[in-house]
């Protein structure tokens, strides 16, 4: 494999092990020319998928693009990376084993929304706002209404009129991080 740092033609595998869910093989590589170290992943690809976009254009399926779009929705959220990897692998496997060589971008978007709904509600709303092309605040209210109905059934949200518990004292008086604020004259 070519070195991504210096372009050297040969790299050596220093460590090879399966990922936690055994869906990929993780390899640590080193370049003998520049000493650069990097990681590669080897995954099973059941078939070459083609994505049919809304415009009618056909493009090859890109697992990395799927990963990036989920990562953007999850930015600054505390979700275990292993759960994200399982979500991406699950969506990819479902698409590849669907029996079709061609999949619509809508099917991919719906699969991502379904997965994010079970993973992180904020990421679900973020992704939905881009995927469904929200233009007005009402679009968000409608989505949050359906999300609230789902959560009400699970007992996660307080009923209207219920008291919302106050945050613990340590959350209110948490120490500040970083530089102290400058005094203004």
From Swiss-Prot:
Q: Read off the PROSITE patterns from this record.
A: ATP_CONE (PS51161)
* Residue ranges covered by zinc fingers (unnamed): 3-34
Region of interest: Disordered: 1-24, 148-185
UniProtKB keywords: ATP-binding, DNA-binding, Metal-binding, Nucleotide-binding, Repressor, Transcription, Transcription regulation, Zinc, Zinc-finger
Q: Specify the domain of life of the species encoding this protein.
A: Bacteria
**Does Nucleotide-binding count among this protein's keywords?**
yes
Ranges of biased composition (kind: Basic residues): 176-185
Amino acid composition bias (Basic and acidic residues), ranges on this chain: 12-24
Q: State how the cofactor is bound.
A: Binds 1 zinc ion.
- Cite a single GO BP annotation: negative regulation of DNA-templated transcription
Record's keyword annotation contains ATP-binding: yes
> What cofactors does this protein use?
Zn(2+)
Summarize the protein's role.
Negatively regulates transcription of bacterial ribonucleotide reductase nrd genes and operons by binding to NrdR-boxes.
Which PANTHER family does its entry note? TRANSCRIPTIONAL REPRESSOR NRDR
Please give the name of this protein.
Transcriptional repressor NrdR
